[in-house]
Amino acid sequence: SGKSKYIPVTREYLEANHIQGASDTLSILYNQFPQLGLFDGKNMIIGGSIEKLANYPGILSGDISALLIHNMPWYARQAFTPTVDIATAPEWEYKLRETIKQVLQEPIVMFGGVPTWLIVLFRSILEKTGKANLLEIWPRLRLYIHGGVNFAPIKPIFKDLIPSDQFIYQEVYNASE
């Protein structure tokens, strides 16, 4: 409908559906591509925003991507960048600026997030570094996990940002319903 939906999401729901789905996706990818090496570097995920509700202590409100990042298992957090606070920050300019600072210090091998947000982030990174493409910054970049939008019209932009026939684009359906 285009309008924000507020759906109660329990930890059990997140673990049984989204977190298990992420684990299944990585298992399938490693089975198909044993050389993937996703834990040889950092996994960058840019999520939506999250906020604490003043009238409801202990209750968080946010995009499903932000809730997933906030509830990420400890073992996945070890390979995750930027920090949870930055990845789920509500103010876009702050999130962009601080993400760039963090990810330029990391060996990124995989990324996830909304394609249009990532295009803005990646173009800002290229502008800041003066590099021609992302592989000049992160030579071991291997995988983009995406979903939620039609990727076909956007894929050529990513092909320019990551000029490699070996790069893997993995679509997932990560719905909140």
Protein language model regions, located:
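Active-site phosphate/ATP/adenylate-binding loop shared across adenylate-forming ligases
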Residues: 1-177
